[in-house]
């Protein structure tokens, strides 16, 4: 197709949304002429499913709960006045608490203002807040954000080393809906130890975001933490960024959360419309369906040409893959659905994996994200009449063209500028696109049985570790190979896991296990040194 024909196709397939400063171009997706007509009936069903969801239908049958993240930016949509009042009350509480921290009404025990915050959470309790913090942060942040988003001791040590003595004026926000997430519990305990090592009371620095009457909630009440904010059972972790999970850290950082919510609300309003070609979330979902044949046949590559959107692909990775990656459909059929999502940022990626995208296996489609405003204020010229931002724009357009010339499909999202309102709109756009796509392929986007299976398996490993270490410490003076150890505790079938447990325990002095080298690693012998 020559460039003039592509221009006409671009004009025909550009979705423009002035209210949120966002355009979606689907012209470089090679869907057939009859595509929209053929799938319209299924798309209308997806609109109906979404309307039922927003109306309070039990969407997550596993847990018998509603799915109501859309109510967070439009409380009047909540199915009861009580829920609407709770949402409004919580938002007001977040704003008042943040204002108190900023004006010095709420201070650190030293009497000084809090200047930093440590957010402890994992999955949706970290990825959303991290994305927003990185996308909208600046040198003028009221509280500088740090994160414990894993149960990696070295990772937590690095964060604490960076905070250093400023821990005295650091607020810690612990986020866990159930209050029982082990990674978050571990991060909280590591943080508590760090405060105590400096002679500080953790409770005087701590805030909880959790479900009512959860173990974390009870701990916060018992210890007298600074504040508690709710996580409702009808908000899933990966769609919680416009709840207290994301709004509290953002407000404390100094981000305009009213603008964030307004962008999400306006995008919800647009993407609630039933005219498919005018609905950018519906178009996204349909392009995913076209590109992947509705069964995950191709990967989704996210290429934002903006440093501030670096973490967007990680955020979308969870939102999309945890929602869409399902073994069974709603009828119980094994379908193994999913779309793999990865990405980084342009033009960095042009010096990394774009080579394969253009000339390697064609197993993907690209979503480019273009931000028209380069920076606040005027840019210098790096060449006559050319700025650094002009180069970035040129690289984006060149990559898009080069990929399409070689039969690689792409979508392009264009936003006027990157601010809180735009970020809210992008979050809402993808949340709804995920819901529509799930309806198109007949799956439940709002549960995650695979995650629970992994947690249970981890528990089995830790129980086995307890048996292994207990036996070794009782058998003073004796040495065991992994196979001998497995036989001794009656876990012969778990010998590989026993071997991995022994390797890890012997590398960490706190466990009191030493190892002696053998002819091969499988001949290594392990003993207690306590």
Swiss-Prot record:
Pfam families: PGI
InterPro entries: G6P_Isomerase, Phosphoglucose_isomerase_CS, SIS_dom_sf, SIS_PGI_1, SIS_PGI_2
One record GO biological process: glucose 6-phosphate metabolic process
MF (Gene Ontology): carbohydrate derivative binding; glucose-6-phosphate isomerase activity; monosaccharide binding
Key words, A-Z: Cytoplasm, Gluconeogenesis, Glycolysis, Isomerase
Function: Catalyzes the reversible isomerization of glucose-6-phosphate to fructose-6-phosphate.
Organism the protein comes from: Geotalea uraniireducens (strain Rf4) (Geobacter uraniireducens)
Gene coding for it: pgi
Pathway involvement of the protein, from the record: Carbohydrate biosynthesis; gluconeogenesis; Carbohydrate degradation; glycolysis; D-glyceraldehyde 3-phosphate and glycerone phosphate from D-glucose: step 2/4
Similarity remark: Belongs to the GPI family.
Listed name of the protein: Glucose-6-phosphate isomerase
